[in-house]
């Protein structure tokens, strides 16, 4: 399926919010090598090209293995700052106006990096991005679900001195053998602290994990959630309760959640009234930032301009933003889509 050139231009230019991106997953091979050299960290790859070739993982666990290896070069506030600014520049180029960014402190504290170094490095970059690029953002601290809940509790408590620098908690890493109920108590504690709650569920795990994330963890938003399509009653509930799913199509294909983007349930769930939003996940590893995900999805599925408008609106509707700022972004989206798309200039025929 070939996307209309005018629509392709519109989806590239529409204002968007990115609600599902792991900052460690934006580490491009070039930056990994640069930081490794700066910090004198030995890498098991002789070149940038060899590292990029290693990105040919086959499932979530093999991806996570290389993901954690790449993160080993992050040691100082400057490293976290540089990684974050690299992401911001790419996001701004894709017309991302607001981002709610995941970070995994346990990946770094396990290596002896203080949690303050992690949070301050990322948050300082985002503060500069707000001034330099008018880029709105917030941080969501994620717990690694393959580790014990006690580790999550310790991470949350260690992060409390930096409470003003993040807005919520999430749950990521391998779903298999790590159901939502494993983290019920730490999510209850986060809720007591007034933090927003999100959770990865229904990616490699079953639809029941989506239900459990809602009912046990009290998640306000579900990350991935595509396996909900296997449970029609759950799809109806998601639509009725306006629970947003932060869907990452290129990630789902790369990790073999679906064999082909044409098999992805995004369009079916959108048509069923679910608040679907479209994001990049770990773009350095999955071969696509926001616009690449949007373009590939529109090329693979029977989506039109009305769907694009809805997806852009949904991304801001689902964001943890103050009401006035959210209304301003939604007005910006609606104004953008109220104008008829302009076709790109035609290329002059060869003489």
UniProtKB/Swiss-Prot annotation:
InterPro entries: A_deaminase_dom, ADE, Ado/ade_deaminase, Metal_Hydrolase. CDD domains: ADA. The active site is at 203 (proton donor). One of its GO terms (cellular component) is cytosol. It is an enzyme of class 3 (hydrolase). Keywords: Hydrolase, Metal-binding, Nucleotide metabolism, Zinc. The record marks 224 as: Important for catalytic activity. Catalyzes the hydrolytic deamination of adenine to hypoxanthine. Plays an important role in the purine salvage pathway and in nitrogen catabolism. Belongs to the metallo-dependent hydrolases superfamily. Adenosine and AMP deaminases family. Adenine deaminase type 2 subfamily. This is Adenine deaminase. It comes from Cupriavidus necator (strain ATCC 17699 / DSM 428 / KCTC 22496 / NCIMB 10442 / H16 / Stanier 337). The lineage of its organism: Bacteria, Pseudomonadati, Pseudomonadota, Betaproteobacteria, Burkholderiales.
